[in-house]
């Protein structure tokens, strides 16, 4: 009488484990990039919220709430879960021929890892900085002091290479 085979052989199981390992080798780094990119996007959301404050401050001729206030003073920052955004810079109020695409002198410096959930931030963006320079038309462009990897910078503010 023939015996029936029940279950899988060891070779079949080893092949399945190897395939899962290969898939995981590609999936885990892609997932880590996805997490870092989503956390980095929070910084741009914070900066967009500061646009209104900057516009209010510009009516008084300064980028910050008080012309004598330094970075981090009340009204000049916004803290999120993964980042801290701070208004800095000197308003170019004496420039007479500024075009909408020119910089107005105001900056928002976003430092990752200084938010309320600092220990849960991706290691790929922790302690990195995204500097956004405000244009006359109110939009932002990437500043030179940026240390955040280009692949994590939102396309809306990324410098054209």
UniProtKB/Swiss-Prot annotation:
Its main location: other. InterPro entries: N_methyl_site (IPR012902), Pilin (IPR001082), Pilin-like (IPR045584), T4P/T2SS_Core (IPR050470). Keywords: Disulfide bond, Fimbrium, Membrane, Methylation, Transmembrane, Transmembrane helix. It is a single-pass membrane protein. Signal peptide: none annotated. Disulfide bonds join 63-106. The chain crosses the membrane at residues 8-28. The modification N-methylphenylalanine is found at residue 8. One of its GO terms (biological process) is cell adhesion. It is found in: Fimbrium; Membrane. Residues 1-7 form a propeptide. GO terms for cellular component: membrane; type IV pilus. It comes from the Bacteria. Belongs to the N-Me-Phe pilin family. Major component of the type IV fimbriae that plays an essential role in twitching motility, natural transformation, and protease secretion. The pili are polar flexible filaments of about 5.4 nanometers diameter and 2.5 micrometers average length; they consist of only a single polypeptide chain arranged in a helical configuration of five subunits per turn in the assembled pilus. This is Type IV major fimbrial protein FimA. It comes from Dichelobacter nodosus. The lineage of its organism: Bacteria, Pseudomonadati, Pseudomonadota, Gammaproteobacteria, Cardiobacteriales.
């Amino acid at each position: 009488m023939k015996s029936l085979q029940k279950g899988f052989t060891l070779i079949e199981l080893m092949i399945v484990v190897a395939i899962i390992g290969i898939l995981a080798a590609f999936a885990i780094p892609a997932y880590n990039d996805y997490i870092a990119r989503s956390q980095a996007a929070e910084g741009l959301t914070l900066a967009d919220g500061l646009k209104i404050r900057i516009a209010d401050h510009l009516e008084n001729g300064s980028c910050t709430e008080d012309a004598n206030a330094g970075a981090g003073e009340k009204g000049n920052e916004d803290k999120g879960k993964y980042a801290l955004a701070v208004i800095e810079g000197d308003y170019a109020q004496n420039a007479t021929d500024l075009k909408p695409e020119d910089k107005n002198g105001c900056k928002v410096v976003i430092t990752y890892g200084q938010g309320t959930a600092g220990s849960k931030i991706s290691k790929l963006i922790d302690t990195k900085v995204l500097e956004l320079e405000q244009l006359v038309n109110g939009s932002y462009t990437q500043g030179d002091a940026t240390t955040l990897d280009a692949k994590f910078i939102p396309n809306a503010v990324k410098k054209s290479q």
